[in-house]
Amino acid sequence: PMGGDAYYLMREGTLSGTALEPRHAELLLVTVLASDYSNWTSVHMDGARRAGASEAEIAEAVLCAVPVAGLSAWVVGATAMDAGKN
């Protein structure tokens, strides 16, 4: 429980009250997580949508992962995008 509380506070501190708009912070997290082939990519895609990001912006964020992580990053991102549309 304490670890979860600490993580939540850290996450809120990095996604709100910063120079980046929440939409941009979520899109950056989509790029980073897609490049790491993380299952959490979809969570931040949902966050980006809630913050006002378009599907085109989310796709662009995934594409930014491809040069450093390869086409596998696109597979992770495309799968997460498809799941988020349902």
Residue ranges and their predicted role:
Residues E21-L27, A56-E60:
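Alpha-helical scaffolds flanking conserved acidic
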Residues E57-V66, A78-K85:
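Hydrophobic transmembrane alpha-helix bundles
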Residues T31-V32, H44, V62:
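Buried hydrophobic packing segments
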Residues P1-H24, M45-R50, W74-N86:
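Acidic, glycine/proline-rich low-complexity segments that act as flexible tails and inter-domain linkers
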Residues H24-N39:
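Amphipathic, charged-and-aliphatic alpha-helical interface segments
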